[in-house]
Amino acid sequence: MAKETFDRSKPHLNIGTIGHVDHGKTTLTAAITTVLANAGLSELRSFDSIDNAPEEKERGITINTSHVEYSTANRHYAHVDCPGHADYVKNMVTGAAQMDGAILVVAATDGPMPQTREHILLGRQVGIPRIVVFLNKVDMVDDEELLELVEMEVRELLSFYEYDGDNGPVVSGSALGALNGEQKWVDTVMELMEAVDNWIELPKRDVDKDFLMPVEDVFTITGRGTVATGRIETGVANTGDAVDIIGMGADKLASTITGVEMFRKILDRGEAGDNVGILLRGIEKSQISRGMVICKPGSVKPHSKFEAEVYILKKEEGGRHTPFHNNYRPQFYVRTTDVTGTISLPSGVEMVMPGDNLTITVELLSPIALSEGLRFAIREGGRTVGAGQVTKIIE
């Protein structure tokens, strides 16, 4: 089935499969595309094509990820599946694949395992709002009581990490059975997708959020004034809108948008995702620089101290060869600029090894516009040594 036949009028969501190694995430991903393809809603993707995940580079980090897409009767989904546990950690922490919701796969034969817990924790840390559970391999469990026990364990685990373990859907089935076309199990995959449709909420679109654009470059147009260029991250820029310009420790500037330029044409507006030049009233070129943000007045404040969930690259990934200790001072590449900051490790953690992921506290030398969920890279001498995202603003 050709790509073009997808109905783009359906609301779009990004989801993914998470869970312990060998519990059937990739088999389930293949089963979903197969079952929906047979219902005329998707194109078929074989297990092998998903399992041989291509390498991607995101913020200087190599991650193996498979992307599949499919539709249900109500929605269009982009779905990510990662072959290895380390790929999941990197994917979730760096936000290479932003997820609006996740399908947690738990093998009924095993019950929740260490990575089950770790993926739920990561989901909580990186703000995946809702999780649907697929209890897999139930065809290999004869004992009905055991199934109930596993479901109860999973629900308790979700509740422990502040997900709605009591009300969230848990669907029992067999991904392999569905992939092989056994009707009983095909039905469970359809039931799963119905649960995903109903339980995972549509995210707020970037366009509907407050306006924010990180400044990439600044120049002067004779007779028109100062222009700041960049890619609009969220919201809409309209000619005539008042804006704040928030910078690296400097006092905030107030201005008005006098024009939005795109592909050398003057427009009335620009929206999230557009690369634009914004004309600013009463601002000198010397007052703005790369790394500042232009935003809706009062919507963003500069902060210098925050908690973050980070992944530190292994040596083989181009990261550090040695561990680092408390008060390590790298650069934090946020949006369009580097800012030096000091890392404080959690109590009881003496040092951080390449390949670790953990929660750290960061204090930047100068305050910059920050919000929860914002992603960044950690750099040292111009090379990326880690990546993460802000989980909590402290001050």
UniProtKB/Swiss-Prot annotation:
Entry-linked Pfam families: GTP_EFTU (PF00009), GTP_EFTU_D2 (PF03144), GTP_EFTU_D3 (PF03143)
Main subcellular location of this protein, as a coarse class: cytoplasm
Region of interest: G2: 60-64
MF terms (GO), sorted A to Z: GTP binding; GTPase activity; translation elongation factor activity
Region (G4): 136-139
PROSITE patterns linked: G_TR_1 (PS00301), G_TR_2 (PS51722)
Occurrences of domain tr-type G (ranges): 10-204
Leading EC class: hydrolase
GO CC field: cytosol
Region: G3, residue numbers: 81-84
Cleavable signal peptide: none
Residues the record lists as binding GTP: 19-26, 81-85, 136-139
The organism's place on the tree of life at top rank: Bacteria
Annotated region described as G5, given as residue ranges: 174-176
EC number: 3.6.5.3
Binding site for Mg(2+): T26
Region (G1): 19-26
Transmembrane helix keyword on record: no
Keywords (A to Z) from UniProt: Cytoplasm, Elongation factor, GTP-binding, Hydrolase, Magnesium, Metal-binding, Nucleotide-binding, Protein biosynthesis
Keyword Ligase: no
Substrates-to-products reaction catalysed: GTP + H2O = GDP + phosphate + H(+)
Entry-linked CDD domains: EF_Tu, EFTU_II, EFTU_III
HAMAP family, per database record: EF_Tu_B
Record-stated family: Belongs to the TRAFAC class translation factor GTPase superfamily. Classic translation factor GTPase family. EF-Tu/EF-1A subfamily.
Subunit structure, as described in the record: Monomer.
Protein name: Elongation factor Tu
Lineage: Bacteria, Pseudomonadati, Bacteroidota, Flavobacteriia, Flavobacteriales
